[in-house]
Amino acid sequence: MVEPLLVLIAASTKLTVYTQDDPTFPESVPAIHDSDLAISWHHSIDTVPTLITVVNGQETDRTFGWSRADWQRLTGLDDLGEDLPVMRPGCGSMSVDPDRVDALRVAFTDTPIISRHVELSSAEDEFEAMYARGWTDGLPVIPPTPERVLRMLAGTTRAPQDVVAIAPPDLVELTVEKIAINAVMAGCLPEYLPWVIAALEAVCTDTFNMHGVLATTMPVGPVIICNGPGTRAIGMNSGINALGQGNRANNTIGRAVQLTIRNVGGGRPGEVDRATHGNPGKISFCFAEDELGSPFTSLGTERGIALGQNAVTVFAGEGPRCVVDQLARTADELTNSLVACLQTVHHPKLVIGFDAILIVSPDHGRLFAQEGWTREQLITQLIERSHTPGEQLVRGARGIAEGIPPHLRDATLPKFRPGGILLTYAGGGAGLFSSIVAGWANSAIGSDPVTRVVGS
């Protein structure tokens, strides 16, 4: 349909034709093959055909697709296309093809990416090359091409060179761009990036003490608890297998945090990371609280976040341990079971120096809901019921060398300090099980939980 029109236009005025996919089209009029789509990109062509009028090197008008009236007006040929339909919509330009647009943006715009580019030879397997360079957590990572990084950066309104934090242990400036690169490698979608940024803001604080979390020989790493309506918007899992595999957002947000600390901050196992055993959560340990199903106010609200805001809370924790109680029929009975299990955090005879997360499941949470227990009430009871006479805790008591100093024999001590239990709610709807995540040393000698609002 177009070629006869081009012949008529070329006969009446100066005409330059650019063709995208077929260099032999049109046969009747000379054409320039826009093989790299540079012309199409720079002229913002989103539909073909597009007809543009140019005067003194400046565009004066354009029309796209086929509109008989518009083509007649732009060419001054009043009878152009009289035998053709009045209008046809045209086709999408190759320059807006989703599979090409990111590469074109990199090729033809001033990219904000300033990180060093690493070129791999055609003989190198990119996945093996990244592993050999020490950029992975032992699992394959996604190659962070400029196209992918630009796409990731579109997930935040922050500028690529904004400094988010100083990343331990090497105390390197951590920019949005560096985070985006590692988020790509972890497998994140762009909409996850604000959550990764917020989590890294939190773990890089002196309060959280990421350097210490790495350097300790204990098996701890960042545990990331996400709150707010955004957790549902990005598809995070707070239900069945919330702490396990299978959910992209949960697993890649946590993984991006760990990869960033490794690749930017220098926190690598065998170097600053000195964990005796470590735990699988040091690859990723991230989940959402089930705020809609919870009988309690949310963890985010408890930590000062306004209702409806998105937030992350980071905690230096080990892997989860299961609490089994299938016989308790009252909140009081279940609380006693939870206390008995919490007493074993790190060691039954060590107290106050360690915090813990208690993840209450729906089946267990139902008992508290039926009796109207609040978050504050449950935490208070857990701490009060964890008090133990010092004579049972001192070194040597019960034939166990481990324990507290002898001068505390006559004291009665709680297992946890005030605020030492983070209560959250998640898990599948079936199973009379809850989970405990033991923490590292707390306060000035260790790590305290940190909460940050998730930005845009």
Per-range role (PLM):
Residues 23, 59, 232:
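Surface-exposed, flexible loop/turn segments at secondary-structure boundaries
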Residues 52-89:
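Non-catalytic, surface beta->alpha helical segment in thiol-disulfide oxidoreductase systems
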Residues 83-111:
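Long, low-complexity intrinsically disordered regions
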Residues 15-20, 33-34, 390-397:
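A generic structural motif
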